[in-house]
Structures are given as C-alpha cells and as structure tokens.
C-alpha cells in the first residue's frame, strides 16, 4: 500500500494513491530492458524506422515522424526527406488548410513539425496555423479535432485566435464524466486525449474540475 495502515484513516484519497502506485509499478516493469513490452516497443520502432514516411498521412505519415522523433530514432536524412516532401505537398495543395473537411490534417502535421523543430507558420509559403483559425471549421469534425487543434497549438506555444475557444469547447462538451468520440458513453482514449490537452490550463478552476472528473 502507498499509505501505511496506521495512517490510512488520516488520508482521504488512499485508494487513489494505491492505484497510482500500482500503475507506476507497471510502467517500471515495461521500461525494464528485456521485458516483452520493451521488446515489442523496440520492434515497432525498428519497423517504423525502416519504412518510408509519407507527408499528410495518418498511418505511415506524421504519427511515424512523431513516434520516431520522440524516441530519438528518426535519422537526419529521413527527417529532411519528410520535410522536403511535405513542403511539396503543401505547395501542391495551395492552401493553409490541408483538407476541406478534416482539420485534424493540419493539427497532426503541426505536431509532427514541432517534433522536428520546424515552424508551422511558414511551410512552402503557407501558414498551417491559420488553417485552424475558424471554430466552425474545427468543430465540424467533432471534439476530436478540437482536442488535437489545442494540442497542436501548444506544442510550440503558438498563439491562435481560437485558443480560448478551444479550451472552453472541450470543457463544455463532456460526455458524462469524460469525453467521447461518439455516443453517450465516455471512452478512455478520447478522455485521455482531452486531459492531455487541458493539462497546461489546470490552474483554471473550471478546467481543473473537468480534468479531475475525467480522471475518475
């Protein structure tokens, strides 16, 4: 137990502390070299590193860039190739918006560019941040796009005229005690994403309440 038995009656959240301790123990196990999880992790990274990376694509695109960059496994040559091909794709698209229907395209690319230390405000002469300057456009794809847009802006402390609206929208559009991609039941995946997006603003009372609700 995280709290000695003699002190448990003095601690109101001992159960929560116990659960957190158990989860940290699981994380420590995963991080140990030689465990199956670590082996799988290394295998996946190796596969991603060997495969081609294509710009403005979900699978085999930006998520690969982000994963490899964060793991320190993205070679300079592969990073440069991705960036150059992305610039060509943005130029060919001819707009700050990478998709008429999916604002998550802009958000995902911005996150990937931040992992490379690149400025999304000028990619082949186009401002990918401006592609997310309209709440109607962002919300047309649902709460998922709102969450990823906020995360994207915060990857490099970008300023955005939709910033406060994004935070408010996430807080005001909870499903039960969390968030859901669809339906009336909160799901773990989207709730975790929402909490990640809101975490930098936990000092705000309303945001903090939403975060703690999701954690429950």
Feature roles, as predicted:
Residues 1-216:
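Preference for long, amphipathic alpha-helical scaffolds in soluble/luminal domains
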